[in-house]
């Protein structure tokens, strides 16, 4: 794939982007993780009560107007344009009300689809819906232990009032990310930093989309694109422009040099 590629993800999406940066090494030139769900076991999904919140969430309303009123109340801190998009795309008419002018509506994404992000659906294998051990998804904890294997620079973009990216979590992210030096190329540096958007919670990209976009654009333009164009991109382009004969000569010279080092 054509580089540079930038990975951007929020919450569980941030965890998935970070995981992809490890499992598909060198895919990303940099990644921006917005309030990512990444942490040790004592800060994992089991401690957040997300499964209980999901099961209690209302998913149906008598009319579209009722649904819109409920969503605007629940997400009142969101940017108005973002909230309009949520309402436009997150609810749909129930089958029995399609022909009606205004009938019952439901969330497009049901509780089950959200719940399996947090708790493993053990009933699928066992065939039993009760009596099974409650097992939370381990992705966020797994990724926490893999942070040292990250092979690109990273920006953690956090909500100032978020219960997920608390100071301890941010300190752990910064201290562990991309710290294993064995996978670096000669002269390669990996920048790891954080930015905090004040007065926002876990939904910071929905609450302050412009500020988040400005921070992301600044990170990409001033830091990563300059670094890419000056270093990795330039070096790779120079190699690609060489003839096959020149590449072979370069490879032979390199192997001859290695004989005195190995």
UniProtKB/Swiss-Prot annotation:
Keyword Protein biosynthesis tagged: no
Signal sequence coordinates: none
Listed SUPFAM superfamilies: alpha/beta-Hydrolases
UniProt keyword annotation of Isomerase present: no
Pathway of action: Mycotoxin biosynthesis
Main subcellular location of this protein, as a coarse class: other
Any one of the GO CC terms: peroxisome
Class of this enzyme: hydrolase
Short motif Peroxisomal targeting signal type 1, span: 260-262
Molecular function GO terms recorded: hydrolase activity
Location of this chain's protein in the cell: Peroxisome
Positions in coiled-coil regions: none
Record's keyword terms, sorted: Hydrolase, Peroxisome, Virulence
EC assignment: 3.1.1.-
UniProt-listed InterPro entries: AB_hydrolase_1 (IPR000073), AB_hydrolase_fold (IPR029058)
Function, as annotated: Abhydrolase domain-containing protein; part of the gene clusters that mediate the biosynthesis of the host-selective toxins (HSTs) AF-toxins responsible for Alternaria black spot of strawberry disease by the strawberry pathotype. AF-toxin I and III are valine derivatives of 2,3-dyhydroxy-isovaleric acid and 2-hydroxy-isovaleric acid respectively, while AF II is an isoleucine derivative of 2-hydroxy-valeric acid. These derivatives are bound to a 9,10-epoxy-8-hydroxy-9-methyl-decatrienoic acid (EDA) moiety.
Family as reported in the entry's similarity comment: Belongs to the AB hydrolase superfamily. AKT2 hydrolase family.
Misc remark: Gene clusters encoding host-selective toxins (HSTs) are localized on conditionally dispensable chromosomes (CDCs), also called supernumerary chromosomes, where they are present in multiple copies. The CDCs are not essential for saprophytic growth but controls host-selective pathogenicity.
Protein name, per record: Abhydrolase domain-containing protein AFT2-1
Organism, as annotated: Alternaria alternata (Alternaria rot fungus)
